[in-house]
Amino acid sequence: MCSSDLHVDGWDDPRLPTLVGARRRGYTPEGFRAFAERIGVSKADSWIDYSVLEDCMRDDLNARAERRIAVLDPLKLVIDNYPEGQEEECFAPNHPQKPELGKRAVPFSRELWIEREDFAENPPKGYFRLFPGNSVRLRYGFVVKCTGCEKDASGKVTAVHCEYFPDSKSGTPGADAYKVKGNLHWVSAAHAYACEVRLYDRLFREPNPGAGDRDYIADLNPQSKEIITACLEPALKQAKPEDRFQFERHGYFVADRMDSKPGAPVFSRAVTLKDSWAKG
């Protein structure tokens, strides 16, 4: 068995199709009911693709999960013409389809974290994120124009530099005059919550592990669990065990019911925003 052979972390491992595992993964009873209704009842043997269950969970979590900002692979962004020591608030909706849930304040400062994939020194065609000379909107914040980057001795980019346009802040008069294609999420470096995040994926690479004469252990997905340190908006520090959120642009995450502590939650990915296993 996977559990006894230490391929997983016990019967409540979020990758396992057990009730305790599904609960720890952040799956909801409503999502399971939608799954049962979708597949129906049949007396004949049938094989249901795992993506059907994931789709049901996405639909349910999309409706119920408040939105938050998380940077999973952080790269420093420095706004050179933003006053040092200055801070202000930007305002983000808790749920875009539920205005009754209100908005929350997100702190903004001179140094931010952005996703590493959101910068390219030599971008491919059709790349609308940050690169030297290009402008993007920092979601809920300002429009910025990239002016360059810093690298270490190995050539790895360690920081990106930009300038901002003070009259471009989202929600203020005249902000819509700035027409840009890129819209990036970010977290203030001074306020970010450095958090353990567990990126779970399917336990097996094959839809029918061990089929035929194969050893099912050989079908295990070596990338089914990745642990990273992410930079999260500070509001997420107050999350309670089993609180669920959509991390914008990433997917749906749950505060782990076993390892989270007051003021220091640990998050696990329940499901991505779209099916990463889809063919074509």
Predicted regions and their residues:
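Short, small-residue-biased leader/transition segments that mark boundaries at the very start
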Residues: 1-3
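Basic, alpha-helical terminal appendages of large translation-related enzymes
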Residues: 9, 15-30, 34, 39-280
